[in-house]
Amino acid sequence: LVDTTTFEINLISNEPAMNGKLDWTIGAFYMEHEIENVIRGYRDNDLTGQLRYLCSESFASSDYCYTHDFGIPGRFDVFGADWDFVTDAFPSRESYSVYGQITYSLSDTSRLISGLRYSEDTFTTDVTNFFNVESFQEKGTNDETTWKLTGEIDISDSSMAYLSFTRGFKPGGSNLTFGFTEAQDIEAGRPVAPALVFPTFEAETVDSIEIGLKADLNEGRTRANLAYFTYTYDNLQFQATDPDPYRGGVANIPESEMSGFEVELKSLVSDSLTFDMNLAFLDSEVTSDYMVLDNVDAYQYFFGQEDLRYGLRENVKGNELAKSPEFTADVNFTYETSLSSGTLVTSIFQFIHRGDFQQRVSNNPAVDAIDSYDLINFTLGFDFVGDKWGLDFMILNATDEDGVNSSMTDVFGVAATGLELIPPRQYMLRLSMNY
């Protein structure tokens, strides 16, 4: 259950100040976000072929179900039952910010845009895992001042260059599960394994630089947008695994970078044919030394072997960031013509390339390497006279390409990897009516 309340107010100048040179915007934002998160994850740990559900569940078998013992040591029997993960979590977040932006015309052909935003974010959490084996309450506050500074210059009546510096911010928060401290390991008689996932995680900041060009060419029949950018991350948030089994959450990579180049081109080749192309080139890497435990490697060890799990850590410096394909492309040709009856016919050819990428920062070749794929789509549309009825014929993934759109590897317990496949070839017919 999620309950979110937001409120935002803006004041925008309706007449430029300072002899028509200054436009301004000021505003405020508020958000309250509450979650009731109840998870009952089952797994056939005893290999009976039948799950031993919680007895209070309506679908549980009365002669083969689980009743939790809240006493000691009975509460720990949960780890020998058919459970993967159990939690009752009630996190909440309250956020507010105030901001302002001004655009100042230095001349008829140049402008300076600057903005400032102050944000304060407070989180609270109340978590109980595996019924009553562990409970956790925490509260924290992050505040950050972010900014933007952009210079624009009109090279001609139809082209503009810009340079932008921006700082962004993602607040920290709390985890459902996290590692035991070394003192807790010693007290419990476990092998000592320093924590890699903590009760809370830090805020993430990113400093970006972008330089670009926007131009209208060919007497306005072509629009080209070019941009080169760099992102420098501090405390990049990512999903991490702890040496203690069944424990993982969000952690922070101290330093990482991403840079890229984007091309957007749209051209009216003729009165009937339009060409539309979007290209993106990315390069990313972790730039600081940072040790990460891959749950896929650690899963072979369990309770009592936390030190062995800890020893499997790897330095991810130089690894690619997650889900950052080096090259993507989307190319469209659209042809429009009118029949003698007045019906508008639109045909679209689309080519999509999604480059290969690593689905996690661990860059494990067994599960993280996601191959590239190419898609070809066709659409033939008819907009009949009167603009009331429309009919579209579509062939999606015309070559029936196999591909993985994305994947996710569990960081908590079972180390399973789920794949999101692209749809196979599809034939679609769409009838539309405007009224």
Positions of the model-derived regions?
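Solvent-exposed loop segments that connect transmembrane elements
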Residues: 1, 40-86, 123-142, 173-200, ...
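Outer-membrane beta-barrel channels and translocator barrels
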Residues: 2, 14-19, 107-109, 156-158, ...
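Structural signature of Gram-negative outer-membrane beta-barrels, strongest in the C-terminal barrel
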Residues: 11-14, 23-31, 89-231
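Gram-negative outer-membrane beta-barrel transporters
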Residues: 12, 108, 112, 227-232, ...
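Transmembrane beta-strands of outer-membrane beta-barrel proteins
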Residues: 22-26, 112-114, 161, 222-226, ...
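Transmembrane beta-strands of outer-membrane beta-barrel pores
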Residues: 28-34, 118-122, 165-171, 180, ...
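Membrane-embedded beta-barrel scaffold of Gram-negative outer-membrane proteins
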Residues: 154-162, 193, 198-261, 265-274, ...
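C-terminal beta-signal and adjacent terminal beta-strands/loops
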Residues: 275, 350-362, 382-435
